[in-house]
């Protein structure tokens, strides 16, 4: 049994998907649709840069979605991707929107609009330079929760991504995250401050969640096929209204990726296929369970392999 995975922010790079764009009309049509929806040429930024524009979160989010949907459609229409043995789709953060589009729950037009708005809302939720994120390596989530409890009584310092057994990302107020980093150094633990423009997936994003509420609730969804794993509950959700509510909650909640992967394995998944730029999720799955098969498709060459 297989699960298909779609990456989140941080996997983007200028020129991603260019080989698919050059060769397949279906990809050109997807790019044109996204450009028309957003009323500017996101495709030009994806293919040509500049990198600074691609890294703007309101551009990054729909861009990564467009690449994932493009590659998925090429695999389905030109390489006979067998979906009969696919039990789940799962996406990391914004990747959940890619999963919903590929699962037929959401149109690409609406996903592009929502992700562009989501990016703007998340960036505007906290003044620039007031928030930060740190990746902590080599500690269990229980150890990290004890560590951040020292700082989180009066300040915002929360787990944003539970990525694997040995990688957890913490989000919060910049001064507090810097203090946490110093504390980790004193204890000879490894923390990496992330080059992000806002502290995603924590309660500092409350304003963004409020701003997205009506936009998501007013969007027409249909039940996806196959089922989509929610970042918030770490299991499949089929009720449309609950899916909408969880997409809103996701903005301020931790991404429960480790639990999601373990849940899919418990449900019989033995083969994971990552579709989209980079190999981040493939690396995380390997850290979670070395006994499953993992492959990644980011280029036409990957398909040939």
Identify what each model region corresponds to.
Residues 10-11, 38, 103-252:
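Alpha/beta catalytic cores of group-transfer enzymes, especially the acyltransferase/condensing modules
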Residues 303-305:
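Short, charged, surface-exposed secondary-structure boundary motifs
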Residues 265-268:
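Non-catalytic positions within long, well-ordered alpha-helices that form the structural scaffold/packing
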């Amino acid at each position: 049994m297989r699960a298909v995975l779609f990456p989140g922010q941080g996997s983007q790079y200028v020129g991603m998907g260019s080989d698919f764009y050059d060769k397949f009309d279906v990809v050109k049509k997807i790019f044109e649709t996204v450009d028309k929806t957003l009323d500017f040429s996101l495709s030009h930024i994806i293919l040509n840069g500049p990198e600074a524009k691609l890294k703007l979160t309101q551009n990054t989010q729909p861009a990564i979605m467009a690449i994932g949907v493009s590659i998925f459609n090429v695999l389905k229409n030109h390489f006979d991707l067998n979906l009969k043995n696919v039990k789940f789709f799962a996406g990391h953060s914004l990747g959940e929107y890619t999963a919903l589009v590929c699962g037929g729950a959401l149109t690409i037009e609406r996903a592009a609009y929502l992700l562009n708005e989501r990016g703007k809302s998340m960036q505007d939720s906290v003044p620039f330079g007031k928030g930060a994120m740190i990746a902590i390596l080599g500690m269990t989530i229980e150890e990290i929760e004890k560590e951040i409890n020292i700082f989180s009584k009066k300040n915002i310092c929360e787990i944003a991504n539970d990525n694997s057994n040995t990688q957890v990302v913490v989000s919060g107020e910049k001064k507090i995250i810097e203090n946490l980093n110093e504390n980790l150094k004193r204890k000879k633990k490894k923390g990496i401050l992330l080059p992000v423009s806002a502290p995603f997936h924590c309660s500092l994003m409350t304003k963004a969640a409020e701003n997205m509420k009506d936009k998501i609730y007013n969007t027409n969804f249909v039940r996806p096929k196959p089922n989509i794993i929610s970042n918030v509950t770490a299991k499949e959700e089929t009720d449309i209204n609950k899916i909408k509510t969880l997409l809103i909650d996701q903005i301020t909640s931790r991404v429960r990726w480790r639990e999601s992967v373990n849940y899919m394995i418990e449900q019989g998944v033995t083969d994971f296929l990552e579709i989209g730029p980079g190999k981040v999720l493939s690396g995380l799955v390997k850290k979670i369970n070395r006994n499953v098969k993992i492959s990644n498709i980011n280029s036409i060459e990957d398909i040939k392999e």
